[in-house]
Amino acid sequence: MEYLPIFIDLKNRPVLVVGGGAVAARKIHMLQRATITIVAPALCTELKKVLIKQNISWISKNFQPIMLNKVILVIVATNDSKLNTFIYQNAEKHNILINTVDDKNKCSFIFPAIIDRNPVLIGISSCGKAPILVRILREKLELLLPKSLGFVAKLAGAWRNKVKQHIVDTVLRRQFWEKIFYNGHVVTLMEKGRPKEANKVLNYALNNSVKNKNNKTGHVTLVGAGPGDIGLLTIRGLQVIQQADIILYDYLVNSDILDLARRDADKICVGKHVGNHSISQKKLNQFIVQLAQKGNKVVRLKGGDPFIFGRGGEELQAISEAGIAFQVVPGITAGIGVAAYSGIPLTHRKYAHSVVFITGHNTNGDNQFNWNSLSNNQQTLVIYMGKINAISIRNNLIIHGRNMHTPVAVISRGTYQDQKILIGTLIELEKLTQMADHPALLVIGDVVSLHSKINWFGQKALHYYLINSIINLI
């Protein structure tokens, strides 16, 4: 983070503005609560009007370093480069915050693009890197956020102390406000200009919450985080993550997804590496139950989809037996997401009429799978965690009739920017997996031959696509 985004109360604090043109006038509009002194030999018409309306001092002289005395912040809005440098050097010498308009190198702070729903304020910045992108984001957010948002915030502020007095427990208090805002009823009433009814709803909710304050019950949500790319997390998954008190996550979960959680949420890695289980499944099940019994909103965050080779069913059995409330948010499983990002359609009228998902962990045992069925040349075989037993997989498939020249893809870091795809044939599977990183997904079938024609994720236009996706999502 190049800049610290902070909101400063400038009420009655001394601020110096150097410059008397239209740019200075625009900046002064944001500093209305401050005690402003303008330094400029002459003022534009707009500033003269502002001078009459507001309590602003004007020094009709050239800038002198002594004018910085007792000032906490300086805005420089002149087109004199030498003067701007001189002011900047003096401000830096005295550790005074300074912003030189349109000259980032002479700034100790910069102004963000602002969305004002007083008292709700949103500042957006690219740290001076992409001002047009920031402008577009601001425009999108302006349309997205209701004009009544400020009234909702003021209403919440009016109730804040009363709620704090009646709900002493901080967790319960936060959950109360989450219910109010997520439910949307109060917001809708304020949008319609019906504050009296909104107050009644708040009063009813508070009384009801006080009656049930001893019934502090937690619950567990099993969430599929998708195969890696943060953009593949579902909207429902995002909502649940942002409400969680505790997140128990697998080591494969993208750290960017964890950053979406509340800052005060506990994030605990309970994942398993190949051959290295930090916690047994039985103990993990007990741990989840214990956390929920303490009244926490627990999110069990798993890579891919929790019900496909994720042991989600085992965990929910334990949670259900303990009488804990739970829900499931599906995710895009690696077999589907990674194949799509590799330009490999799992079914195709010409090449494959079915697809089978298996785990490669237990493929050493000859009786573990129906190899005759898996060796069908008209189907696609997707193998999770198949790197370790690649030799056994290859041998069993060929022995049971799969063509040794069947196209194969070994994909690691699937859906990430550094995704690695190794293409070969079934007879070469051992060599391919040796070159791949853990964990790796194996795709076996004639559909792999389409990779070279429809591998979209490696295209030059990718970055444009990603930026467009961000803007369109907002």
Swiss-Prot record:
S-adenosyl-L-methionine binds at P227, G303, G304, D305, I308, T333, A334, M385, G414. The modification Phosphoserine is found at S126. Its EC number is 2.1.1.107, 1.3.1.76, 4.99.1.4. Transmembrane segments: none annotated. GO terms for biological process: cobalamin biosynthetic process; methylation; siroheme biosynthetic process. Signal peptide: none annotated. Pathway: Cofactor biosynthesis; adenosylcobalamin biosynthesis; precorrin-2 from uroporphyrinogen III: step 1/1; Cofactor biosynthesis; adenosylcobalamin biosynthesis; sirohydrochlorin from precorrin-2: step 1/1; Porphyrin-containing compound metabolism; siroheme biosynthesis; precorrin-2 from uroporphyrinogen III: step 1/1; Porphyrin-containing compound metabolism; siroheme biosynthesis; siroheme from sirohydrochlorin: step 1/1. Pfam families: CysG_dimeriser, NAD_binding_7, TP_methylase. It catalyses: uroporphyrinogen III + 2 S-adenosyl-L-methionine = precorrin-2 + 2 S-adenosyl-L-homocysteine + H(+); precorrin-2 + NAD(+) = sirohydrochlorin + NADH + 2 H(+); siroheme + 2 H(+) = sirohydrochlorin + Fe(2+). Residues 218-474 are annotated as: Uroporphyrinogen-III C-methyltransferase. One of its GO terms (molecular function) is sirohydrochlorin ferrochelatase activity. InterPro entries: 4pyrrol_Mease, 4pyrrol_Methylase_sf, 4pyrrole_Mease_sub1, 4pyrrole_Mease_sub2, CobA/CysG_C, NAD(P)-bd_dom_sf, Siro_Cobalamin_biosynth, Sirohaem_synt_dimer_dom_sf. Residues 1-202 are annotated as: Precorrin-2 dehydrogenase /sirohydrochlorin ferrochelatase. NAD(+) binds at A22, V23, P41, A42. Keywords: Cobalamin biosynthesis, Lyase, Methyltransferase, Multifunctional enzyme, NAD, Oxidoreductase, Phosphoprotein, Porphyrin biosynthesis, S-adenosyl-L-methionine, Transferase. The active site is at D250, K272. Then it catalyzes the NAD-dependent ring dehydrogenation of precorrin-2 to yield sirohydrochlorin. Finally, it catalyzes the ferrochelation of sirohydrochlorin to yield siroheme. HAMAP family: Siroheme_synth. In the N-terminal section; belongs to the precorrin-2 dehydrogenase / sirohydrochlorin ferrochelatase family. This is Siroheme synthase. It comes from Blochmanniella pennsylvanica (strain BPEN). The lineage of its organism: Bacteria, Pseudomonadati, Pseudomonadota, Gammaproteobacteria, Enterobacterales.
